[in-house]
């Protein structure tokens, strides 16, 4: 019997295993999943704060971070053709879509998605080996040989006709990822884009720890101070932390900080009043002054901003701590400018533990549209092992599930069919 082995039991790996089992002729192919964790899907259970934001209705190449957008297009088309949402519907998963296009299981439970996958894998006879750590993977004339250590610490050797590498990247080591997939891709001669934490918070050079825990609606702009240009703009809720900035819009900006191609001297500029231009905001501030006779700057922000945030902004504008009605009219233009151009420099992405996904990876031109590695027939790389990281909102799970489905189906197609036995004619 021919065998397909999937290395990694995360979203991409489970989808690959199930798609392969669904596509294989009955009794012709054994499908095996190896995962180092005590249970598969550990990271999947944590996605979407446990609700599993598994897809998005706005899938487009522009929603992904990669060094080669042109190479991404045919790959993303193949992933879209795998139709993850329709595939899940056929498995019995009912979903809902919110106003931002984010797709969730109707139950809002990531555990239900995992249980559904596990149930179908068991029904189709897929062997799942947990607590199994892959040590080496080698290619030979008959296919591939995998050396791994099982949960009891015993060495095990498996033979495979096709291997799907779904071991994730470096993001979220607490979920069992260790970057083996990308390291193995390099060992096979594959070229890698440098790895970096993607969709993560940002440390700033001078964090204001008094603001830790405060949230504010803002337009966040990533600047390249060396090139004097805007890299990207995101709107949403910013969370101030004791180390810098967080929140979905900040995490989105972190995706642009790829080593070698991102801004050399990045900075984030916050606009705390994006609905008003600077002239209108100046007028708004000036109109408040007659309402606050003899009042201190701390009173100025009542009804506008969190008082701690207002005090920090006042300090950033370098205005004196005097009654607001004693300040010159020009002060309100200065304050409006500070509120719309609050600069945070010295950016450093937080580490792998906080990152939601991995930027960089095996370059996309190294694989076919069905994510088969061009240098090794029967070897596939899916999900985070590839240089494709999605934005927040279900784009990464779309890529994980879709690339896994595409790989699983193609792996079955790639297997050499045994020659049919000749019919013996009766004499």
Give residue ranges: language-model regions:
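An anion/pyrophosphate-binding glycine-rich loop and adjacent beta-alpha core
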Residues: 38-40, 45-46, 54, 58-61, ...
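Glycine-rich active-site loop/strand segments that organize a redox cofactor
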Residues: 49-97
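A glycine-rich dinucleotide-binding beta-alpha-beta segment and adjacent secondary-structure elements
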Residues: 130, 310-389
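Glycine-rich loop(s) and the adjacent beta-strand/alpha-helix scaffold that form part
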Residues: 162-208
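A conserved short coil-to-beta-strand element within the FAD-binding core of flavoproteins
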Residues: 130-143
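Glycine-rich FAD pyrophosphate-binding loop
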Residues: 21-49
């Amino acid at each position: 019997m021919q065998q397909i082995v999937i290395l990694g039991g995360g979203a991409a790996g489970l989808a690959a295993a199930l798609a392969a089992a669904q596509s294989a002729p009955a009794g012709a192919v054994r499908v095996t999943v190896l995962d180092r964790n005590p249970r598969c899907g550990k990271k999947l259970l944590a996605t979407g704060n446990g609700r599993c934001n598994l897809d998005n209705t706005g899938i487009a190449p522009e929603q992904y971070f990669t060094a080669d957008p042109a190479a991404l297009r045919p790959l993303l088309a193949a992933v879209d053709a795998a139709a993850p949402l329709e595939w899940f519907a056929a498995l019995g998963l009912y979903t809902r879509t919110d106003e931002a296009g984010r797709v969730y299981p109707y139950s809002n439970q990531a555990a239900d998605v995992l249980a559904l996958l596990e149930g179908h894998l068991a029904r189709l006879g897929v062997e799942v080996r947990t607590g199994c750590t892959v040590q080496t993977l080698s290619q030979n004339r008959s296919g591939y040989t995998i050396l791994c250590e099982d949960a009891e610490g015993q060495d095990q050797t498996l033979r495979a006709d096709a291997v799907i590498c779904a071991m994730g990247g470096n993001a979220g080591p607490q979920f069992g990822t260790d970057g083996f997939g990308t390291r193995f891709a390099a060992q096979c001669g594959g070229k890698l884009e440098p790895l970096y934490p993607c969709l993560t918070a940002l440390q700033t050079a001078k964090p204001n720890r008094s603001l830790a825990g405060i949230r504010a609606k803002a337009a966040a702009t990533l600047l390249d101070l060396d090139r004097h240009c805007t890299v990207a703009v995101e709107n949403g809720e910013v969370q101030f932390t004791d180390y810098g900035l967080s929140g979905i819009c900040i995490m989105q900006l972190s995706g642009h900080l790829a080593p070698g191609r991102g801004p050399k001297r990045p900075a984030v500029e916050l606009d705390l009043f994006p609905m008003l231009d600077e002239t209108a905001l100046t007028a708004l501030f000036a109109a408040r002054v007659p309402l606050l006779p003899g009042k201190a700057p701390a009173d100025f922000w009542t009804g506008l901003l969190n008082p701690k945030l207002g005090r920090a902004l006042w300090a950033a504008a370098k205005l004196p701590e005097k009654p607001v009605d004693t300040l010159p009219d020009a002060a309100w233009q200065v304050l409006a400018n500070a509120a719309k151009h609050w600069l945070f420099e010295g950016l450093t992405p937080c580490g792998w533990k906080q990152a939601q996904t991995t930027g960089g990876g095996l370059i996309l031109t190294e694989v076919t549209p069905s994510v088969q590695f061009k240098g090794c027939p029967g070897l596939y790389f899916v999900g985070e092992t590839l240089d494709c990281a999605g934005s927040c909102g279900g784009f990464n799970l779309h890529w994980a599930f879709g690339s896994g489905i595409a790989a699983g189906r193609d792996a079955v197609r790639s297997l050499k069919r045994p020659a049919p036995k000749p019919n013996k004619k009766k004499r």
